[in-house]
Amino acid sequence: MTWHATLSLDYRLESERSVLRHVHDGPLRVLKSLYPQGDGTCHNVLVHPPGGLVGGDTLDIQIAVGAGAHALITTPGATRFYRSSGEPAVQRTRLRLEALARMEWLPLEAILYSGCQAENHLSFELAPGAELIAWDVTALGLPHAGLPFVRGRFCQHIELPGVWLERGVIDAADTRLLGSPLGLAGQRCMASLFFVTGSALERPRRDLALDGARQILQAHALQSSAGVTCPNPRVVVLRVLAPQVEMAMDLLKKVWAVWRQVLWNQAAVQPRIWAM
């Protein structure tokens, strides 16, 4: 049996409070809205009760953040792509921000189990003045649990339409990509953190983002396998390779906290679910 689930989230600023309205179909839900930072920022947790995806499953997530609203979204656990007999398992996420909206898209990692056929699509659309901090973390198997990624294929698509596009394929049979120093160099976790804007970044703010991330990198255990760049005036990207998810997540969380402070003048308040 395959699952086809959709979830639409719509955040609006009402009387200075970011309010969520949502519609779902299938096994994809959102938990109660929380406001640990006050009414201006709405925290939510997305849950997928089946716990993972197999061949033929699809998850479609549509998120809109209205003018002036601020949403932070995470998940309670990893997205797991299990072995497939042929059909791909697909997750599609579209984030759309209106003018002056802010959003933080901070799901936990996606785990690729051996034998999976998986696709992950993530797209952003930002109106002028909107800003997004988002990350994407992928683990190739669970090697420390004796479950390496030795078969399967993963397609990744990340896009800010008309501005920036990343598209790649990881095939477990591609030993040059997985093992070469010019590829993943034997690392089994890859992660990216993005700061994306609806308007071109002015140089002082761009430098704040770059310098803040580089200061964290210089003191981090992953400094030799991470870097931060500005490939477009509307995008700043930090990328990292790591032997395990925990190290990559530690780096991303630290840079996220710095970016929140220097770019938005807001202290980082971690979602409560992360402490469980």
Curated annotation (Swiss-Prot):
Gene Ontology CC: one annotated term: cytoplasm
Superkingdom of this protein's organism: Bacteria
Pfam families documented for this protein: UreD (PF01774)
InterPro entries: UreD (IPR002669)
Keyword flag rRNA-binding: no
GO molecular function, one term: nickel cation binding
Main location: cytoplasm
Transmembrane segments: none
Subcellular location: Cytoplasm
Keywords on record: Chaperone, Cytoplasm, Nickel insertion
Keyword field contains Transmembrane helix: no
Self-association state and partner proteins as the record states: UreD, UreF and UreG form a complex that acts as a GTP-hydrolysis-dependent molecular chaperone, activating the urease apoprotein by helping to assemble the nickel containing metallocenter of UreC. The UreE protein probably delivers the nickel.
Function comment: Required for maturation of urease via the functional incorporation of the urease nickel metallocenter.
PANTHER family noted in UniProt: UREASE ACCESSORY PROTEIN D
Family classification: Belongs to the UreD family.
Name of the protein in its database record: Urease accessory protein UreD
Source organism (scientific name): Albidiferax ferrireducens (strain ATCC BAA-621 / DSM 15236 / T118) (Rhodoferax ferrireducens)
